[in-house]
């Protein structure tokens, strides 16, 4: 190798610019350039050793570096086999002289460097080694990626400033020399290249170098190598060397080799991006397909074709059978874009043909659509067009249906003429509407709900417990139950009880309207019940004479007396019970306890499938007195809690007294009666009296004790007040008396009306009627 002292031999060339030499078929022209500096032979060798990506032609070597200006002289190899390939027109003086090789640099400056023959031989060997590596890569395409990676590493090293290049070369140079000798023996023509720095604005036309056909053939081989390399490997190869690039362009008969700028490199080397024109137009195509599918479905339904008919007709016409599912998926946009694009022209053609044939055959025959042109077999079996009824017509039909659910043929014809509809359509609509009505309101199996239910239950036992003070009889025991509607109903119902222990029948009437005042009160413990009676207007005549009972004062109990009067006679009945109350009463409730009615209640339970403990509460529920009965288990056997409408009595009483509670009774208040609170007596009892001369439901004071009337308190209860004696009303006294000394001895009366509005409840036993 050359020592560094040989670098002193290099001097700046400023000789004539017209003298040219020819080496290996290449013409070089010397150019005067300013002196830029000299480099050592080792540095030149290191620089040339890294140019694995450079294509070389003959003995000419041209390299580019931004920070170096190098010009070297190359000598002609005497005795080399390549000298025989030199043109015979070369002057002898030029052959004996040492030719110079110019290295064209990026800055446009050229400097000459004179090298010894040994140095020139070394440079030539290195250049030939690079060409051999490139040719070997052509032959071995399987290892092209590895060569590309190695070239990328070497190119990156070549792109660095020369100051960073080591002065010593690896052992690879020796291997390259051996390969170069083999190439020289094969007389391989090397290619011609010009290196230009990427920042140079020179045009490729400035570097047109003529070469022999053998050189062109070698260049084509190199070009094929670059073409065969994968695009990804080229991209990886070009990324590490942004400062030195090479672009080859084929020309005829010459080859133009130039460098492109860094900015244009990715565009020239990488694969150009494909402009996907269909993708840009795809949204519009999708919109067009969607619109066509919607229009196709509407027009198909208008023509009266099913999806299956369309598929069969298209098979008859165009030879492509489509199933009903395919047509359905097309209309629902569930097919792929490609399949929809294929199917659209066929459907469009069929639709146009169908519409044209339909318009042509409208005047002639409605069945012309079943012609063979549209697939007669498929279209002959198509369904009848579905009838769509407008809203106003539907409302008119509903009104007609409410008037008459089963119209006659004449009625249907009249309705069809009025609505401008087909008679068959109207007939089918009424038939479907009747079926719908049956589903909504199924008919009851037990008959109509408006018909009364009457049942007679014989009772082997007596209705009322027999006591020595009561008069018995042998009258048969029957129980007649009719469904009792609420008090607001217009129906007149009754509940009649006939007992063998009673001389007469006790009838409770709930009338729609009464001409006079109707009151029912409970009498005192006085044995003369005639002084404490109230009149009840009833349509049922009396059955027998009055039956009285002895005084009940020895035993604290509650007695209830009901009277029934008519224009013919008057009957009074007194009944004694001794069933204690286990629980307090609630608001808007009537307590009825008659242990003697247990047997009849049991018979009613069996018939109505009621619970065993329903007792009279179940009877009242079955009779329709109230749907909101309390649980019968809270009361003694035979007791019932009848809850009536809160508005029957609460609307007539004073709001100050009623508050949120309601005094309820079996009978409602009279039409315009009121109960004003007149005064409080000395004992704290409330006194209700008539308001002036206006007609009133209460003809005599009604006494309430709000402090002591709670049924669970231990205080004695007294509803009889001295204020009753001071009343000057000449009408029959209507009063209620219930006395008790303890909770255990409290007896329940036949009619007990409770209103619990707070800790101290108010209780009255007055029953009114509407």
UniProtKB/Swiss-Prot annotation:
* Residues with PTM Phosphothreonine: 271, 277
List residues of the POU-specific domain.
281-355
PTM comment, free text: Phosphorylated by PRKDC.
GO CC terms, sorted: nucleus; transcription regulator complex
Q: Alphabetically, which GO biological process terms does the record hold?
A: lens induction in camera-type eye; negative regulation of DNA-templated transcription; olfactory placode formation; positive regulation of transcription by RNA polymerase II; transcription by RNA polymerase II
Ranges of Polar residues compositional bias?
1-26, 262-272
The places in or outside the cell where this protein is found are: Nucleus
* CDD domains linked: homeodomain
Query: Which regions are flagged for Low complexity bias?
Result: 80-97, 357-372, 519-580
Q: What does this protein do?
A: Transcription factor that binds to the octamer motif (5'-ATTTGCAT-3') and activates the promoters of the genes for some small nuclear RNAs (snRNA) and of genes such as those for histone H2B and immunoglobulins. Modulates transcription transactivation by NR3C1, AR and PGR.
Name of this protein: POU domain, class 2, transcription factor 1
Organism (species):
Mus musculus
The beginning of the lineage is: Eukaryota, Metazoa, Chordata, Craniata, Vertebrata
Write the gene name: Pou2f1
């Amino acid at each position: 190798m050359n020592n560094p002292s040989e670098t002193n031999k290099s001097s700046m060339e400023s000789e004539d610019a017209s003298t040219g030499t020819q080496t290996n078929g290449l013409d070089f022209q010397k150019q005067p350039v300013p002196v830029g500096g000299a480099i050592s032979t080792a540095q030149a060798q290191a620089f040339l050793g890294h140019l694995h990506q450079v294509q070389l032609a003959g003995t000419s070597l041209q390299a580019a570096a931004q920070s170096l200006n190098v010009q070297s002289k190359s000598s002609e190899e005497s005795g080399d086999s390549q000298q025989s390939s030199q043109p015979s027109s070369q002057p002898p003086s030029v052959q004996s002289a040492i030719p110079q090789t110019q290295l064209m640099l990026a800055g446009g400056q050229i400097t000459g460097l004179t090298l010894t023959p040994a140095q020139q031989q070394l440079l030539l060997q290195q250049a030939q080694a690079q060409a051999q590596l490139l040719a070997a890569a052509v032959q071995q395409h399987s290892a092209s990626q590895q060569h590309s990676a190695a070239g990328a590493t070497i190119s990156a090293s070549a792109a660095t400033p020369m100051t960073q290049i080591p002065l010593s070369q690896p052992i690879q140079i020796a291997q390259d020399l051996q390969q170069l000798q083999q190439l020289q023996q094969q007389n391989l023509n090397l290619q011609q290249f010009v290196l230009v720095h990427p920042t140079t604005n020179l045009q490729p036309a400035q570097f047109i170098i003529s070469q022999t056909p053998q050189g062109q053939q070698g260049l084509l081989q190199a070009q094929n190598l670059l073409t065969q390399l994968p695009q990804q490997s080229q991209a990886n190869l070009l990324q590490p060397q942004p400062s030195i690039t090479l672009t080859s362009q084929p020309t005829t008969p010459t080859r133009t080799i130039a460098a492109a700028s860094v900015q244009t490199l990715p565009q020239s080397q990488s694969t150009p991006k494909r402009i996907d024109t269909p993708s840009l137009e795809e949204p519009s195509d999708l919109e067009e397909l969607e619109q066509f599918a919607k229009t196709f479905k509407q027009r198909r339904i208008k023509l009266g074709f099913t999806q299956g008919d369309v598929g069969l007709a298209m098979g008859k016409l165009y030879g492509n059978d489509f199933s009903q599912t395919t047509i359905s998926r097309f209309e629902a946009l569930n097919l792929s874009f490609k399949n929809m694009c294929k199917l659209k022209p066929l459907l469009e053609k069929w639709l146009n043909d169908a519409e044209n044939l339909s318009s042509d055959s409208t005047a002639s025959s409605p069945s012309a659509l079943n012609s063979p042109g549209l697939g007669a077999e498929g279209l002959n079996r198509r369904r009848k067009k579905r009838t769509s009824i407008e809203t106003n017509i539907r409302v008119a039909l509903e009104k007609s249906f409410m008037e008459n659910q089963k119209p006659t043929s004449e009625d249907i014809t009249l309705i069809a003429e009025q609505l401008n509809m087909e008679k068959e359509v109207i007939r089918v609509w009424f038939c479907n509407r009747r079926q719908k009505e049956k589903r909504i309101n199924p008919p009851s199996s037990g008959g109509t709900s408006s018909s009364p239910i009457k049942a007679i239950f014989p009772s082997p036992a007596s209705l009322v417990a027999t006591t020595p003070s009561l008069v018995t009889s042998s009258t048969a025991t029957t129980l007649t139950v009719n469904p009792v509607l609420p008090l607001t109903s217009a129906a007149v119902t009754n509940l009649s009880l006939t007992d063998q222990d009673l001389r007469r029948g006790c009838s409770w009437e709930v009338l729609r309207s009464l001409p006079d005042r109707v009151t029912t009160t409970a009498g005192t413990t006085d044995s003369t019940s005639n002084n404490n009676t109230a009149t009840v207007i009833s349509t049922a005549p009396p059955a027998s004479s009055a039956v009285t009972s002895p005084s009940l004062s020895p035993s604290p109990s509650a007695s209830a007396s009901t009277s029934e009067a008519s224009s013919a006679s008057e009957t009074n009945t007194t009944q004694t019970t001794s069933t204690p109350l286990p629980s307090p009463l609630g608001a808007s409730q009537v307590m009825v306890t008659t242990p003697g009615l247990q047997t009849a209640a049991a018979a009613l339970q069996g018939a109505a499938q009621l619970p065993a403990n329903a007792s009279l509460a179940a009877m009242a529920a079955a009779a329709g007195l109230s749907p909101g009965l309390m649980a019968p288990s809270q009361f003694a056997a035979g007791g019932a809690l009848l809850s009536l409408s809160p508005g029957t009595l609460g609307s007539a009483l004073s709001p100050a007294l009623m508050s949120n509670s309601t005094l309820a009774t079996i009978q409602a208040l009279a039409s315009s009666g009121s109960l004003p609170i007149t005064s409080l007596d000395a004992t704290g009892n409330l006194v209700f009296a008539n308001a002036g001369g206006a007609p009133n439901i209460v003809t005599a004071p009604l006494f309430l004790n709000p402090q002591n009337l709670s049924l669970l308190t231990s205080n004695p209860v007294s509803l009889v007040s001295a204020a009753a004696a001071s009343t000057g009303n000449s009408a029959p006294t209507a009063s209620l008396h219930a006395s008790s000394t303890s909770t255990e001895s409290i007896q329940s009366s036949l009619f007990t009306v409770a209103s619990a509005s707070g800790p101290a409840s108010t209780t009255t036993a007055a029953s009114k009627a509407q």
